[in-house]
Amino acid sequence: VQRLQNAGVLTPDSLLAHCTYVDDVGLDIIRRSGSSIVNCPESDLFNSTGCCPVFKILEKGITLGIGSDSYAADMLEVAKMSLSELRHTAGLPNAGFPEVARILFDGNAKIASRTFGIPIGRIQKGAAADIIIMDYIPYTPLSAVNTDRHIIFGMSGHECVMTMAAGRVLMRNRRLTFAREDILSRKTTAAAEDLWQSVNQDAQNRLLHYE
């Protein structure tokens, strides 16, 4: 973190991902810079790279969001993993839920609003029309008091039937509106094979060089 500060890259527009090894000194630097942190719990746990110090970050008043470095695409599953991570690190079976809800609903909206220069994360005049519709059937009482718990515990991405971004419907009835998924699949599969071949060839060339 000190190196980033010395290089002049820590600004209110900076996003610091993971931060599993950051200490109190580093967090104080981040707080003073106005930078934000994004926790990526599924990737961190999968790669055994440690856990983001969520409680310390929030205590210091640093803006914290939750996301993924492409390991996961379902943010509700990421939120569930974040909750498990927090309870494990705290050693308390009842800890973490208020923090996860705050990160998911408030932290992400604050970061996105600042990044894109428009209110995000609310339904009101002048805000970005970013809306999803979930086909969710609650099996316990659902009210304004426990909506966040139903979202995090009860829902998952496969229940999303409509996605709208900036007023444009991108998915309707679980089908993309702007592209054909079969064509995308063929293109991404071919691109992945080309990438793998290129990486393998580069690795072989390096081995030959060192031999």
Per-range role (PLM):
Residues F105-E211:
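Active-site microenvironment of metallo-dependent hydrolases
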Residues N6-V9, D13, P53-P138, G154-M155:
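His/Asp/Glu-enriched, well-ordered alpha-helical/loop segment
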Residues L45-S48, R114-F116:
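Active-site glycine- and acidic-residue-rich loops that bind
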Residues V1-S36, N47-L64:
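Histidine/acidic residue-rich metal-binding segments in metalloenzymes
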Residues P41-F46, D69-Y71:
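Short, acidic/turn-prone active-site loops that include or flank metal/cofactor-
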Residues L16, I30, I37, A79, ...:
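Conserved, mostly hydrophobic/aromatic
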Residues L27, G50-C51, L76, V145, ...:
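Conserved strand-to-helix beginnings and helix N-cap segments that scaffold or border functional pockets
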Residues I30-C40, A190-D194, S198:
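Short, electropositive alpha-helical surface patch
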